[in-house]
């Protein structure tokens, strides 16, 4: 590799930053026809702007949803007229987005690149400038900073866009490239991870709320699929089943405490407390209903017994009145018999003169 690059002579810069990029990438395997310098710079700027955004699996879903052709991926020849600035800008472009290096699969025109560069000011992507930031860090670690004339016009455009993004959406903060899967996808399809491709940083919460639209399924739909924060996943694929639907009221009441505790293993403490309070409320409600039913039933029984006793009292009263009438009849008959017998026998001293004698 060093012998191949030595052929170019003084075409390559000798700064530590440029040599670092030369050692990292094999430039001889990219055989792409050279394009004009102005178009190269515009396309490289657009490539850096869209490097950290959400990329879909379809190449041409949006004007800047895919990577434009590399400006100069062929090794510099001694007779080429390109200067050192162009090569340094190409290195910035390569580190910003290394995951798609096949420029022939995409037909990206300079007009699309200019339009994407203009639209990038309306949709700031703070995570799109990792390559530029890494370049600055490497330059500082090497013991010197790259002058402004070596960085070229593309770096100035990148700095201006970074300032515009910071003014519109606050200071951009960068996340580590941890692939947090979403907890709730569109149809339980595995969730669209934050890191859409290696080398692209996930957007901040402010940019994700602005650009995160569309359902992020397993294959990635449009240009902005599944950008929401992973901890705010919706209720998909059966993971957030509410326990009110799992246990009916009758099951909660009739289930034993041991069985309920076995069913609630792995459930949060708040959910367990809420379910047990609901079970206690249902039990108290059932106990109150049973007591109310028993009271009503006992009242009906007592009322029926009272009616029976009243009927018996009426019957006894009727019996008493009948017996009184019979007594009066017998008494009257007796008095008649006593008066008739006294007249027949006459009055004598042996016979008593009063009817009490015969009694």
Curated annotation (Swiss-Prot):
GO biological process: gene expression; inner ear development; lens fiber cell differentiation; megakaryocyte differentiation; negative regulation of transcription by RNA polymerase II; positive regulation of gene expression; regulation of chondrocyte differentiation; regulation of transcription by RNA polymerase II
Predominant location: nucleus
Subcellular location: Nucleus
Region (Leucine-zipper): 302-323
SMART domains: BRLZ
Keyword ATP-binding: no
Bias (Basic residues): 173-183
Tissue: Expressed in kidney, brain, lung, gut, mesenterium, testis and ovary.
Coiled-coil regions listed: none
Residue span(s) of domain bZIP: 274-337
Keyword Transmembrane: no
Alphabetized UniProt keyword annotations: Activator, DNA-binding, Nucleus, Repressor, Transcription, Transcription regulation
Molecular function as annotated in GO: DNA-binding transcription activator activity, RNA polymerase II-specific; DNA-binding transcription factor activity, RNA polymerase II-specific; identical protein binding; RNA polymerase II cis-regulatory region sequence-specific DNA binding
Positions of the UniProt region annotated as Disordered: 57-85, 169-243, 340-359
Family (UniProt): Belongs to the bZIP family. Maf subfamily.
Oligomeric form and interacting partners: Homodimer or heterodimer. Binds DNA as a homodimer or a heterodimer. Interacts with HOXD12, PAX6 and PRRX1; interaction is direct and inhibits its DNA-binding and transactivating activity.
Domain-level remarks: The basic region and the leucine zipper structure are necessary for association with HOXD12 and PRRX1.
This protein's name: Transcription factor Maf
Organism expressing this protein natively: Gallus gallus (Chicken)
